UniProtKB/Swiss-Prot annotation:
Protein name: Rho GTPase-activating protein 12
Domain SH3: 12-74
Keyword terms, alphabetized: GTPase activation, Phosphoprotein, Repeat, SH3 domain
Pfam family, one: PH
Region (Disordered): 110-241, 293-317, 428-466, 591-625
GO molecular function, one term: GTPase activator activity
Superkingdom of the organism of origin: Eukaryota
PH domain residues: 463-575
Biased composition (Polar residues): 117-174, 191-200, 224-234, 445-461
Cellular component terms per the entry's GO annotation: cytoplasm; phagocytic cup
Annotated WW domain residues: 265-298, 358-391
GO biological process: actin filament organization; negative regulation of small GTPase mediated signal transduction; phagocytosis, engulfment; signal transduction
Phosphothreonine: modified positions: T230, T231
Organism: Macaca fascicularis (Crab-eating macaque)
Length: 847
C-alpha cells in the first residue's frame, strides 16, 4: 500500500511520527511498507515495540515498529503565507538556483566583532531575509540564482557611494526581489553579499538556499533563511556597531538601549531596570556595562546564579537572528511583560499561554516556532498572526473593561505552586495575568511589591486568597469518624471557604477556567486549626482542621515552607472571621446617635412624600437587621454535634450500632429489624432453595440498609424488597457490622476451649458461657437460632443443612478481636460451635 507523503498537511496539536529506517511486513489483509522520511499520524503507543499510526484522518490505522520511527514534536498552526509581487517571467535568467537551507559552512568560525559585540561594517551575504509576514510570490522562479555584492561602510548612517563593488540599481533590485508591501526588516549584522560575479559558479562563495523537505514545513512566513556573517581580512573594526538604513529595500534595525541617565527603577544583583524617553523598559549591567531590551535570565529563573549570566563572550555564540526577533517582538508586546491592551492572559490546562479578548471573548494561543520566534493562532485553528489582533472598542466598552480590571488590582501574598516532579515555586500575584512573563516594571507612582505599602495591602485578610497542591484526608464527617484516604487535591482559599478540587482548572483557581467542580468545601467560620499529633498521622508536616459542622481534616505537604504558609494563612483567616462576626454583632446592638435622629426628624418634616417611602424602607431594613442578628447569634451559639447527640436530638443508626444501646433505645432486648426480617423469611422464604446461602443484590441491600438507618417506615412486602435474598442478605449484614459480635470478644477463647472438650461436656460448657453473655445477646441469639432451626427442618425444600447454616453464620456470629495466623483453625471451631447450638437447641435454651 502507498504510505503517507512527507509533505502532507500538518494538523495543529496532532502527534506525528517520522520513519527513520525502511521497513516492510505482511499484515493479514495487506502489505505494509514504510520508507525513510515519511510521516504518519500517531494514533496510539500500544507498547514499547509497536505503535499504531495512520497516513491521514480518513485512512485505516496499522502498526509500525517503534524502534524504526521517532516521534515528531507536535506542530502548532503556522502563520499564513502572504503573497507578494513576484519576478516577471521574461526576466533575464541570472538565477541558476535558489533554495532554502540552514547554513553550516561557518559554524565554527565566528565573525569579527566590534566593541559592542556586533559584526563589522563590511559584510558579505548571498541571501535576503524576509519580513516576518512576507513571502516570495507565486511568480518567483526557484530555478534562478543571483550573486550580489554591496560594500556597506558606516558613514553617519549612510552608505558610501565610492564602493568598488558592483552596484545594483533599484530597477534591477525590484526585478530580482519583487515588491515587498509594508515595512521590510533586514538585519544588516547577519546579511552578507558575495563578491563573486560569476553566475555559473555552482555554489562557490554563495549559499544555496533550498526548502528542507525533511522538516515538513512549507515555504511560509514562519521559516527564515539562515544568513551567515563574515569579515574580509582587509577591513578594520569600527568604533561603534553598524546600523544601515537601506531606503529602497525598506530595511530597519533596532538600536541598543541608551545609557542610563536616571536612577534605576529596580535593582537585582548587577542588573538595573531603567526606562527610556518613551517609557520602554530596558536592562543595564553595571559590571559589564551591557544593555539589552530583552529581560536577563534572572527575571525568568530566580534560581540561576550570577555565574550563569551570559557574558559578552557568550553572546558571540548567539544567533543574531534570535536577537533580532526578540528585539522586534518586544516592541509589539507590552513593555513590562503584560498582555496588550484589550487582552487578558492566562494558562490553559496544558500550560500553554492563552489570550482572551476583552471585547469579543475570542481565544488565541501563543506558540514558538522552530526558529525561536513567537506567534499567535486562534483556538479553533482558523487564523494565525505574528501579533494579536487589534479591536476598536467603543468608549462604553473600554470603561466597563477598565472598571472590571480595577476590581482585580488587589495585591496579594505570593501564590505557592508545586510543579509536578519539580520543586515548589513562589509566584507573585502581580504575575497572574502573565505567568510566563518577566519581572514586571512598576510606574514611578506605584509601589513595588517589596514596599511597606504593598505588604499592608497584601496582608489584608478580607482579600486573602491562596492556591496550591496539598495532600488532604477526612478523619471525621458530621461528627462521625471515617476511614483515612489521602488524596492529592488542588486547594483554593477564597474568603472564609477552603475548596478542594481534583484538578487545577477550578473556577476559583487563578487560571480562571470553569471546567472543574470542587470535590468538597470547608467553611472556616468557627473552625479550629492545630498541628496534628503523631497518633493522628505518621506523616510529617500535618495539621488538623476542625469545623463547626463536625468535619475534621488532615492537611499535609512534603514541603516545610508550603505547609507553614498554609498554616499561617488559615490561622489568620479563621481569627479574622471570628473578629468580623463579633464586630458585626456589636455594631448592630449599638443605638443610633441623637444627632442622627434629630437630623432625620428635620428631614421628615421638610419632605412628607419621602417620609412614607423612608418609613417602609426603614422597617424592611430593621427586620433584615433583626434576622441577621438572630442568625449570627444562632451560628455562634450553636452546640456541637456531639452535644446534640448526647441530648438525644440525633439518633444513632441501626446498622453498626452497639447491640445493647440499640435495644435500650428501642425499649426491648431484641432489635426490631431482626424480628422483622425473621418473620418475613419464615412467612415467604422457608421453601426457597439455598436460603441464606445465596447472596442478594448488594445495591438493593444497601438501599434497604439506608431506609432502616433513616427511620423510614419500612414495609418488607413492598415490591422493592420482593427478592427474599435481599432480606436475608440485610440480616447477615446487620450481624456482620455489629461493633462486637453476638458471641462477645472476651468469650471467644472460652467458646473455643469448650468445643474442644469431650462431647458430653461440650453442651454444658457452651450453655454456661451463653448465660454469661449480656441479656440482649442472649435473647437475640435465642430467637435467631430458633429461626435457623426451622430453616433446617425445611431442608427437603430449601436443601439447607446444619453444616451449611453453620458455614454461613459461624464467622459472622463468632470471631476474635484481633485476627491471627490461625484463621483456618478458628473457622473450623466457629462452624462447630454454631452447629452444636443448632443440634442441642432445646438443651441450651429450653423448649
Amino acid at each position: 500500500m502507498k504510505m503517507a507523503d512527507r509533505s502532507g498537511k500538518i494538523i495543529p496539536g496532532q502527534a506525528y511520527i517520522e520513519v527513520e529506517y525502511d521497513y516492510e511486513y505482511e499484515a493479514k489483509d495487506r502489505k505494509i511498507v514504510i520508507k525513510q522520511g515519511e510521516r504518519y499520524i500517531l494514533v496510539k503507543k500500544t507498547n514499547d515495540d509497536w505503535w499504531q499510526v495512520k497516513p491521514d484522518e480518513n485512512s485505516k490505522a496499522f502498526y509500525v515498529p517503534a524502534q524504526y520511527v521517532k516521534e515528531v514534536t507536535r506542530k502548532a498552526l503556522m502563520p499564513p503565507v502572504k503573497q507578494v509581487a513576484g519576478l516577471p517571467n521574461n526576466s533575464t535568467k541570472i538565477m541558476q538556483s535558489l533554495h532554502l537551507q540552514r547554513s553550516t559552512e561557518n559554524v565554527n568560525k565566528l565573525p569579527e566583532l566590534s566593541s559592542f559585540g556586533k559584526p563589522s561594517s563590511s559584510v558579505q551575504g548571498t541571501g535576503l531575509t524576509r519580513d516576518a509576514n512576507q513571502n516570495f510570490g507565486p511568480s518567483y522562479n526557484p530555478g534562478h540564482t543571483v550573486n550580489l555584492s554591496l560594500d556597506l561602510t558606516h558613514n553617519n548612517g549612510k552608505f558610501n557611494n565610492d564602493s568598488h563593488s558592483p552596484k545594483v540599481s533599484s530597477q534591477n533590485r525590484t526585478r530580482l526581489f519583487g515588491h515587498f508591501p509594508g515595512p521590510e526588516f533586514l538585519d544588516v549584522e547577519k546579511t552578507s553579499f558575495s563578491q563573486e560575479q560569476s553566475c555559473d559558479s555552482a555554489g562557490e562563495g554563495s549559499e544555496r538556499i533550498h526548502q528542507d523537505s525533511e522538516s515538513g514545513d512549507e515555504l511560509s512566513s514562519s521559516s527564515t533563511e539562515q544568513i551567515r556573517a563574515t569579515t574580509p581580512p582587509n577591513q578594520g573594526r569600527p568604533d561603534s556597531p553598524v546600523y544601515a538604513n537601506l531606503q529602497e529595500l525598506k530595511i530597519s534595525q533596532s538600536a541598543l538601549p541608551p545609557l542610563p541617565g536616571s536612577p534605576a527603577i529596580q535593582i537585582n544583583g548587577e542588573w538595573e531596570t531603567h526606562k527610556d524617553s518613551s517609557g520602554r523598559c530596558y536592562y543595564y549591567d553595571r559590571g559589564t556595562q551591557e544593555r539589552t531590551w530583552k529581560p536577563p535570565r534572572w527575571t525568568r529563573d530566580a534560581s540561576i546564579s550570577k555565574g550563569d549570566f551570559q557574558s559578552p563572550g557568550d553572546q558571540e555564540l548567539l544567533s543574531s537572528e534570535e536577537n533580532y526577533y526578540s528585539t522586534s517582538y518586544s516592541q509589539s508586546d507590552s513593555q513590562c511583560g503584560s498582555p496588550p491592551r484589550g487582552w487578558s492572559e492566562e494558562l490553559d490546562e496544558r500550560g500553554h499561554t492563552l489570550y482572551t479578548s476583552d471585547y469579543t471573548n475570542e481565544k488565541w494561543l501563543k506558540h514558538i516556532d522552530d526558529q525561536g520566534r513567537q506567534y499567535y493562532y486562534s483556538a479553533d485553528g482558523s487564523r494565525s498572526e505574528w501579533e494579536l489582533p487589534k479591536y476598536n472598542a467603543s468608549s462604553q466598552q473600554q470603561r466597563e473593561i477598565i472598571k472590571s480590571r480595577s476590581l482585580d488590582r488587589r495585591l496579594q501574598e505570593p501564590i505557592v505552586l508545586t510543579k509536578w516532579r519539580h520543586s515548589t515555586i513562589v509566584l507573585d500575584t502581580n504575575d497572574k495575568e502573565s505567568p510566563t512573563a518577566s519581572k514586571p516594571c512598576f510606574p514611578e507612582n506605584e509601589s513595588s511589591p517589596s514596599s511597606p505599602k504593598h505588604q499592608d495591602t497584601a496582608s489584608s485578610p478580607k482579600d486573602q486568597e491562596k492556591y496550591g497542591l496539598l495532600n488532604v484526608t477526612k478523619i471525621a464527617e458530621n461528627g462521625k469518624k471515617v476511614r483515612k484516604n489521602w488524596l492529592s487535591s488542588w486547594a483554593v482559599l477564597q474568603g472564609s471557604s477552603l475548596l478542594f478540587t481534583k484538578t487545577q482548572g477550578s473556577s476559583t483557581s487563578w487560571f480562571g477556567s470553569n471546567q472543574s467542580k470542587p470535590e468538597f468545601t470547608v467553611d472556616l467560620k468557627g473552625a479550629t486549626i492545630e498541628m496534628a499529633s503523631k497518633d493522628k498521622s505518621s506523616k510529617k508536616n500535618v495539621f488538623e482542621l476542625k469545623t463547626r459542622q463536625g468535619t475534621e481534616l488532615l492537611i499535609q505537604s512534603d514541603n516545610d515552607t508550603v505547609i507553614n504558609d498554609w498554616f499561617k494563612v488559615l490561622s489568620s483567616t479563621i481569627n479574622n472571621q471570628a473578629v468580623d462576626t463579633d464586630e458585626g454583632i456589636e455594631e448592630e446592638i449599638l443605638p443610633d446617635s441623637p444627632g442622627i435622629e434629630k437630623h432625620d426628624k428635620e428631614k421628615e418634616q421638610k419632605d412628607p412624600k419621602k417620609l412614607r417611602s423612608f418609613k417602609v424602607s426603614s422597617i424592611d431594613s430593621s427586620e433584615q437587621k433583626k434576622t441577621k442578628k438572630n442568625l449570627k447569634k444562632f451560628l455562634t451559639r450553636r452546640p456541637t454535634l456531639q452535644a446534640v447527640r448526647e441530648k438525644g436530638y440525633i439518633k444513632d443508626q441501626v446498622f453498626g450500632s452497639n447491640l445493647a444501646n440499640l435495644c435500650q433505645r428501642e425499649n426491648g432486648t431484641v432489635p426490631k429489624f431482626v424480628k422483622l426480617c425473621i418473620e418475613h423469611v419464615e412467612e415467604y422464604g422457608l421453601d426457597v432453595d439455598g436460603i441464606y446461602r445465596v447472596s442478594g443484590n448488594l445495591a438493593v441491600i444497601q438501599k434497604l440498609r439506608f431506609a432502616v438507618n433513616h427511620d423510614e417506615k419500612l414495609d418488607l412486602n413492598d415490591s422493592k424488597w420482593e427478592d427474599i435474598h435481599v432480606i436475608t442478605g440485610a440480616l447477615k449484614m446487620f450481624f456482620r457490622e455489629l461493633p462486637e459480635p453476638l458471641f462477645t470478644f472476651n468469650h471467644f477463647n472460652d467458646f473455643v476451649n469448650a468445643i474442644k472438650q469431650e462431647p458430653r461436656q461440650r453442651v454444658a460448657a457452651v450453655k454456661d458461657l451463653i448465660r454469661q453473655l449480656p441479656k440482649p445477646n442472649q435473647d437475640t441469639m435465642q430467637i435467631l437460632f430458633r429461626h435457623l432451626k426451622r430453616v433446617v427442618e425445611n431442608g427437603e425444600k430449601n436443601r439447607m443443612t446444619y453444616q451449611s447454616i453453620a458455614i454461613v453464620f459461624g464467622p459472622t456470629l463468632l470471631k476474635p478481636e484481633k485476627e491471627t495466623g490461625n484463621i483456618a483453625v478458628h473457622t473450623v471451631y466457629q462452624n462447630q460451635i454454631v452447629e452444636l447450638i443448632l443440634l442441642e437447641l432445646s438443651s441450651i435454651f429450653g423448649r
